[in-house]
Amino acid sequence: MPTNLLLALVLAMTITPAYGAALPPCPASPNCVSSQAEDKHRIAPFVVKGDPAQAFSCLHTLLLKRSDTTVVAFDKSMIKVEIRTLLGFVDDGLFLLAPDMAVIHVRSAARLGYWDLGKNRRRTEEIRQQFTQACLSQ
């Protein structure tokens, strides 16, 4: 199999999780939150009301409008973002649509450092509030 084709397959599989796919686990450090974590990293998923695909598309639009956020990958079930902090650090965000559960799973983690002073949790809650106002009140 040609190397380019193999590389394309690997990339497609890593950036396009299936519905209900698992988020990567958080590291032991306190600089990550995940709606699929069972410990101190746990944060609630975004609840979807109405059409899940429409809500997910609305979340995508909301993320595109944020000045600190760059959408690096998007498909019908996954949004992957990079978020630049005021100090220039880059955090990674991942949103996975689980339409059968009427939720969007979320993970946000710092790329560097040990402790983020709760920034990923606060930012995720801020995005949740924006999502609720913009996407669920239609």
Model-derived segments and their meaning:
Residues 16-138:
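Ser/Thr-rich, low-complexity intrinsically disordered terminal regions
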